[in-house]
Amino acid sequence: MAQSIEAILAELKRGVENIYSEEDLIAKLKENRPLRIKLGADPTAPDIHLGHTVVINKLRQFQQLGHEVIFLIGDFTGMVGDPSGKNTTRPPLTREDVLRNAETYKQQLFKILDPNKTRVVFNSAWLNELGTEGMIRLTSNYTVARMLERDDFKKRFTNNQPIAIHEFIYPLLQGYDSVALQADVELGGTDQTFNLLVGRELQKSAEQKPQVAITLPLLVGLDGEKKMSKSLGNYIGVTEAPNEMFGKVMSISDELMWDWYNLLSFRPLAEITQLKADVDAGKNPRDVKILLAKEIITRFHSEAEADLAEQHFINRFQKGAIPDEMPEFCFNGEIGLATLLKEAGLVASTSEAIRSAQQGGVKIDGQKIDDVRANAQLGTFVYQVGKRKFARVTVK
């Protein structure tokens, strides 16, 4: 039995921040044809983390509803550099960097999307053909005043920080992608709102029906404060080992867990609502977090590896009598392990930290560490000294 437009819309709105506009989306859905859904990414790094997958999951949802899914790799725009959310000019990448990163992107992408039903395109195919005349026509669609309405540009202009001309051009190039593809819908994070709306306006100028712009929240990272980012060290890469992924998911706060369920889980909303009710009724949130960790690991590895990671976690943590409650600390920037142990109150001095490690009394996530003279690793881990001293520490 076919779903009603209302039911489909309710499903598509899950986890969404804004739709520009919902009326346009309803009208397109009523056309009863496969819509052309666009998601673009500049491959600025070789690996995808869970934060990137929020919009990819939404793309998968459209794919499962029978729509035409286009994943656009910005091999041209990646060499320009997206200024979205940046306080300084992003350094451009070489074409070799972009193409190398694009290959690993595709491999990781198809852990979520059906490769046989996904069209992968490169925007150099049409942007290289623009030429000088085409670029001048494109830039004539927008004014500097309109560009300065954008928050990140406005802040930099107000603070007398430089804005390069090519950064003004970037949103126009991304918008032109939508014209070239005749996109019906474009997906992006909330930091992409301006760029997506430029696409709508350029399509109107090209006498196309404007795309619907759907924005999704940025996933909060392991620290529970800032968006997931490699530079902040609060991320989980989709290629990380199952045991590492499991431990990191289990380290997030109980409050953050529900946001992750909403943005990362494929479970029906009714099931998530029931899990929340179970926790409110007294169920240990750790057990619900285990379900989330296993779901994520199954997606990027396998169900068997998820089961092994769970057992590994139980053996290292629960059987090792690591408590659920412990002091939590957060340090910014580089910090030596010995200093970290001292600042977290696990030892009285750095010399005691060194001595305890040499005697086998220091553990990080259950693993013995015999040398604490190195710097602490970025991320959130459980640090233990002796049998009874524990602290959950985030270094970012």
From Swiss-Prot:
The keyword Glycoprotein does not apply. It catalyses: tRNA(Tyr) + L-tyrosine + ATP = L-tyrosyl-tRNA(Tyr) + AMP + diphosphate + H(+). Pfam families: S4, tRNA-synt_1b. GO terms for biological process: tyrosyl-tRNA aminoacylation. Gene3D superfamilies: HUPs, RNA-binding S4 domain, Tyrosyl-Transfer RNA Synthetase. One of its GO terms (cellular component) is cytosol. Signal peptide: none annotated. It comes from the Bacteria. SMART domains: S4 (SM00363). Keywords: Aminoacyl-tRNA synthetase, ATP-binding, Cytoplasm, Ligase, Nucleotide-binding, Protein biosynthesis, RNA-binding. ATP binds at residue 230. Its main location: cytoplasm. GO terms for molecular function: ATP binding; RNA binding; tyrosine-tRNA ligase activity. Its EC number is 6.1.1.1. Coiled coil: none annotated. Homodimer. Belongs to the class-I aminoacyl-tRNA synthetase family. TyrS type 2 subfamily. HAMAP family: Tyr_tRNA_synth_type2. PANTHER family: TYROSINE--TRNA LIGASE, TYROSYL-TRNA SYNTHETASE. Catalyzes the attachment of tyrosine to tRNA(Tyr) in a two-step reaction: tyrosine is first activated by ATP to form Tyr-AMP and then transferred to the acceptor end of tRNA(Tyr). This is Tyrosine--tRNA ligase.
